[in-house]
Amino acid sequence: MNVSDFHFDLPDELIARYPLKERSASRLLSLDGLSGQTTHLKFTDLPDLLQPGDLLVFNNTRVIPARLFGQKETGGKVEILVERLLGEKELLAHTRSSKSPKEGQRLLLEDGAALRMLARKDALFHFVYEGDEAFLDVLERIGHMPLPPYMEREDEQSDRERYQTVYAKEAGAVAAPTAGLHFDDVVLSALKAKGIEFAYVTLHVGAGTFQPVRVDKIEDHVMHSEIAHVPEETVKAVNEARARGGRVVAVGTTSVRSLESASRAGRLQEFRGDTDIFIYPGYRFQTVDAMITNFHLPESTLIMLVSAFAGYNNIMSAYREAVEQKYRFFSYGDAMFLTAQEPSRGMMLGTDSAEPHQTESRGESQ
């Protein structure tokens, strides 16, 4: 397929640049992957779409204030976007300045903290923080929330709360797992009251999620790599859901990619490592039966993923309908509930055979 097959026209006014006052006040477009039928709902209607015994799998990554501003010792301005923390003192980052930093060069941050460049790794720069505290503490003090470029605004104090899920726990993402932004205590309580089970994965969303696809054929795209962890207790929760006839419902594409990365030929196992899994039409899902997701950018890898899940024609038709109905798009926008166009290969497996492993998997090879 061509990347252009995933284009759709989106009026600028439908891009949500700020969140609604209440997290769960968003709209919810339900799409049946088998029939293609759509239903227009509110996000607070989500419990009505689920059955007791279903399992919701959330991504509990926490967005770090990853954008920094500083200057070189020569006085030139520099902007830094942390891509990945490497322990307490070291990091990989993107930089923006008139000239790229050189090995050994120091960058001075807003409060006098300093980074020294150790090496360049492709498009990223490897830095070490020269202070005594953990660099994450520096980010919390002077960093800015890394809002997506399409918001076309500077971050505000309120983004520290709203560009973060209420269940965020593991620090490391530079973009929010946005499907989770709709959940508040009211919705979570209603889900628990209905007998819906919860489980968690961690995928630290990288800045690569905002990079455009620069090839014509989707098969030629090389996916960026991100750190993911599917713990043994989540594998157990999935197996128990299967045993009682419940569905595995992934909250967001990051949860989908985590679970599918941890599935080997239909076998879900504990997973910890890097994943560059790229899911597009033709991929056979191993574990996920339904998903909650936001509306994604035209020609992005994420609209390719949801097309693989609920059907290309179904998704493109639903997106056109969402535009007509003036749904709000992207990170701070509205949500979709998708069921699969065909059953996953999920099956009941015991956790005694689960073992940690690292893979770098591509969707087309599964």
Curated annotation (Swiss-Prot):
HAMAP family: QueA (MF_00113). Keywords: Cytoplasm, Queuosine biosynthesis, S-adenosyl-L-methionine, Transferase. GO terms for biological process: queuosine biosynthetic process; tRNA wobble guanine modification. Transfers and isomerizes the ribose moiety from AdoMet to the 7-aminomethyl group of 7-deazaguanine (preQ1-tRNA) to give epoxyqueuosine (oQ-tRNA). Residues 347-366 are annotated as: Disordered. This is S-adenosylmethionine:tRNA ribosyltransferase-isomerase. It is found in: Cytoplasm. It catalyses: 7-aminomethyl-7-carbaguanosine(34) in tRNA + S-adenosyl-L-methionine = epoxyqueuosine(34) in tRNA + adenine + L-methionine + 2 H(+). NCBIfam families: PRK00147.1, queA. It comes from Marinobacter nauticus (strain ATCC 700491 / DSM 11845 / VT8) (Marinobacter aquaeolei).
